[in-house]
Amino acid sequence: MRVALLSLIAPVTGDSGGAGGALGGASPILPRGLMRLGGHTLARHQLAIALALGCDRVIVVAPGGLDGLLPLQHAAESAGALFHRVSGAHGIMGLVSAQDEVIALGDGVLAWPDLAQELLATPTVLVQPVEQGVAAGFERLDFNYASAGAMRFPGRLVERLSELPGDVEPFACLQRIALQGGVPQRSVPDEVIAQGRWNLLHNEREIQAVEPDWISHHLFEDGALQPSEWLAGQVVRLAGPALLEAGSGGTVVAMAAGVLAALGLVAGGFGALTLGLLLVALAWLGFACASMFGRFERRSLRLPRPRLAPAVTYRWIVDGVLLALLGLAHGERTYVAALFEPLMLLGLIRLVPAVVANRKAAWMEDRALLALVLSLLSLFGLLRNGVAVLAVALLLGGIIMAGRQNRLTST
């Protein structure tokens, strides 16, 4: 069995120095691990790393009177892991067998998840140069190295805690035991430290300093971005922390976007097609923001699927509203005739990017851009013919790009 060991002992401090103390004394008002980053506690982000590394059991060392662990327990158990809370080092021993592997993360350590998975893939004690490590608040190990606040070691070493007092700080002691037991050291790459992708956070000021980069890292994926996706990313970077801290995140944004789409449909029903199309453009931007929130949560917490509706649902909603609005633009014609051209346009917008591997083709899927173009056509009284012209242009553009793509692949 693979066991995760998390600590909620060291308190939030007003400066950036100092390592976590022992378990003795009064319980801290707020441990570092319960500070929130991107709407979730540092302990929850550490749990995501542990679960991604295949941990089946989660042990949290925390003072007896500490509240706030229930969400962490629910997250662990919903992922199929066993959850245990202990108040001291000796409580760990009965939960780890000699055949187990232990993955331990120190108080307040924040690591980029993909990086942590790579560095902790094998048994190791992660270290860093002593100057930068001690300056950041990590424990000094020897003349050359400081701790990096993470390690993976055999479970048989846990039994050595029985030789120590019960009020020692478990991570620091197990780190020494692992090094004495022959677990190899591995240095965190210098560029990782320099880029701020491996941190020890002591207070809210330090949380706020790393939060923008943390959010940006988990927002954007490889590949071409639609204009509305880029704009949504900037909105989430600016307003995201406040919404995430409030606990609403993308849910409120998705609901607001749904209201805008409904208002656009109502406006079109009353003959204000230009206004309706502008509202649809705003609705798509809102849905893009909600998708960004879902992507951030999925990637930062290593979730198998987002908790919000998938982007394909938002696409169907907006396409349905656009189809209705464009159909209303042909009010005197039969329903079949009124919907034919809009159906061809929306169908080609879905089809061409799917069959053409071209970065520019991704722009065709941007419903906000489409709605803005359609609103301009409506403003100048060109909507009916404009839909047909856009459909033909998409068809010809798709044929040309597909032909170029075939020539490139054949050569």
How would you label these PLM feature ranges?
Residues 308-411:
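Generic detector of multi-pass transmembrane helix bundles and their immediately adjacent loops
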Residues 229-306, 310:
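Core alpha-helical transmembrane segments of integral membrane proteins
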Residues 70-74, 97-99, 109-183, 286, ...:
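Conserved core of the sugar-phosphate nucleotidyltransferase
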Residues 15, 144-265:
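Conserved alpha/beta core of the MobA/IspD/sugar-nucleotide pyrophosphorylase nucleotidyltransferase superfamily
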Residues 1-7, 51, 55-60, 101-102, ...:
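Hydrophobic beta-strand segments of well-ordered beta-sheets in folded domains
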Residues 61, 86-88, 129, 186-190:
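Conserved beta-strand termini and adjacent loop/short-helix elements that scaffold enzyme active sites
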Residues 1-66:
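N-terminal glycine-rich phosphate-binding loop and ensuing alpha1 helix
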Residues 63-114:
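Short phosphate-binding loop-to-helix
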